[in-house]
Amino acid sequence: AAALVASGAYKTVAVTAGGCTAKLGMNGKDHVKKGLPILEDMLGGFSVIVTQDDGVSPEINLDILGRHSVGTGSAPQAVIGSLVTDPLERNGLKVTDIDKFSPEMQNPDITKPAGAGDVPLANYKMIAALAVKKGDLQKADLAKFTVEHGFTGWAPTQGHIPSGVPCIGHVRNAIMDGKMKRVMVIGKGSLFLGRMTNLFDGVSFVIQANSGAEKAA
């Protein structure tokens, strides 16, 4: 969407997605099996409007894009490397230059009883571990990293719904208020693709404070 706007092909693009009843049923089945009430009883959805630069609103930096190619493999370290550390390194940035990361933002109150653990926390631990390996972070700061650069998951766990984008409204407000400068949104993982091919898919991008001088979506 940002590329379409930045190219001038379109002035405004709406990115819209809805939840999935099949995933809702899968989670509910796991909860009932453990004698719990069905904790996820709603369909998620979101819509994001991407439009031309107004010189004020946060922008998407199209120079910092992470991609997960087939050759990357499915190992967690390889996935996070291709989506997080690689694009940052290409642009002369460290992991610690990003104020917040928004990976798979599933609500742990829902995923833990279903046996999937705390998904956002697992992602933050991997990002922090890679940052230590790259020399961007001290090992003693690993625990602090997840608090300072992460969010607690709050989104419904339906496929693409929690994958990065739930933070966008909150992040926009925080950047406008001067509380944040750069945030990386990470969309990754596909349950069904993974089960069929043992592969992942994914993309990441950075939302940042308006640069003013540059034309950006």
Language-model segments: which ranges?
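Active-site-proximal alpha-helical scaffold in enzymes
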Residues: 1-11, 50, 158-178
